């Protein structure tokens, strides 16, 4: 950056106003989130000291439930099935299937106390016989039961629902009706046996990390979790601790009025807010940009030692990316051939929960390393080619430390799941929480690596005492610039990661609280800190290549960050609708999560404008990098906006959709499409800068890979996610969530499970080509840089 860049004060009154609005918004949002945190702790489902039958026999205790939660995490069951709809979609949802079994066995016990067969009356001209979660309710004709039987059956169903709903979890000692107590004993036996029984037809091998006592306690935790979904809150007699989720009408779980009301209010609010944001864009951002342009990155400077050393980061990104695709391919195959992988028995060697654990963490690793390396490469260029002493050595150290943490953590994950790491599973094994499976020791080291990245970015952006003092003076006088925001984004990433380590030295007794903090990392990383970094870095690149002025770039970033904080922080609530938190998460989550769509609309508008600028340039060296960056803006809007915030976040939609293949569709298109493509675009930017002004930079492999990714994503959507996800949503509505998540349901759609393969082939071909392209470009000699040649500068056509 030039001396003028460092000293020129901000003279844009609109930017000055937006800075203050951003500050107030950020403080207010996190203050509200703090208040909501207090309420979540206060209103989480309580754990009675004991559940007993009427004779005083203890069925399970609070200690059993807490130990069972530890067993659930230790065995990483969240990466085989799910709890409260959170986790893997391969196995059953333990909460829903257990709830249905409790209803079935309670009803059978009630029926056996008399002589009435266990049927339930269904709407219309049919009755439904309650079965297990792996079998849809069976329709029978009215003639199948006499009027007296039907009346008795309805009475038994009503009694079963009343007894389950009347369980008062606020009591220190819960005395259960005989029928419910007998049902719990039956489910305890079933679950304990299932956890220790090989079932290759379901892709399940016994949880090696669970001993007999811990298996029974894990069953107790699952049963308790199921009870929280049907037991009513004392202050809301029509609402369970999970807002009546999952949808299981057989036990009386249907959407609440709260869910229905706030869905429609949020839709109205969204359309109003979208109109307001579009007006702001037209009024203050969408006008001719006649301000002076800066072209700091348009000049190819001699590479600094640290820039040269980032090449090995890009190689690791490529390798982890390929490994992630391999794990994903095996997982996808497991849905349609659960016993074997093309005749090879992998379930014992590579159990599904380990594959999923790796597949979830791998994108975080390669996207994170891509951003870390790109940031470390671009920062010295931002500083004008200057570098602090020892920066190259520190970049090397960070690489090897990061590589050690990644490899050791993944090995620990595997050994923990396989039961090799027993007593130290929490610290060195697998924590069993989706996306943050790393053992706590590895989490701490990972946090240290992130902190080191921020420190290195700080040294790279302001390498001398003079530049640091000037930047500090700018910041404290309110002249906050894009360079400050880029560094603040790195701090934001690591600060939010801290909350995934609460409590630091052990597990929390409540899954509701554990999952609350998990979403602080997963959601706030993606929807707030990742978006923060993406917006700030993308805007700086545009500005420093002379495509937009600093004034317009900073205006755009401030406005987008305001919307990102509004939607990203409090929008966390849409993940907390059904996990046992207070009912206020429904209005809070839906209103603010719909705001997440608004910055994505701005991203699309800006992407269109950027595309026009690049197309209007006669020469632009970074067209390949910007192809990926524009692609990330598109998929951010489609994956996170259309398939996520614009539809699935609505409470009434989410009530039925939560935990289905439509969520997988949202996850794949938004994580890779939005942030993966951005990471790859930044890497291609660095590779082009690294090649120098006179190098022959072949863009063809990168372009082919880009279109392979896009075609692969589209094929996944229309040949896999939609053909399974939409019928699955129908199945939830017609038969309940447990049936829609059963293997019996999936077996009806084996053809569409197989149709995942074409998209995998196309996508993987792009990945292989791109990784080869990375290697070739890193081996390419760097061009002459003795003179600063502004070849990267866009030149007006004509």
Can you say where each PLM-predicted feature lies in the sequence?
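Hydrophobic or amphipathic alpha-helical targeting/insertion segments
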Residues: 77-83, 88-117, 143-158, 162, ...
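Membrane-interfacial, low-structure loops and terminal tails that flank and connect transmembrane helices
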Residues: 2-13, 287-310, 466-480, 613-621, ...
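Membrane-interfacial helical/loop segments at transmembrane boundaries in membrane proteins
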Residues: 341-347, 421-432, 512-514, 518, ...
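Post-cleavage N-terminal segment of exported redox proteins
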Residues: 2-61
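Perimembrane loop-to-helix junctions flanking transmembrane segments
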Residues: 53-56, 341-354, 656-659
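Soluble extramembrane regions of membrane proteins in the secretory/endomembrane system
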Residues: 42-259
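Hydrophobic cores of alpha-helical transmembrane segments in multi-pass integral membrane proteins
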Residues: 19-39, 68, 72, 80, ...
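Non-cytosolic membrane-interface motifs at loop->transmembrane helix junctions
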Residues: 428-439, 513-522, 581-592, 659-664
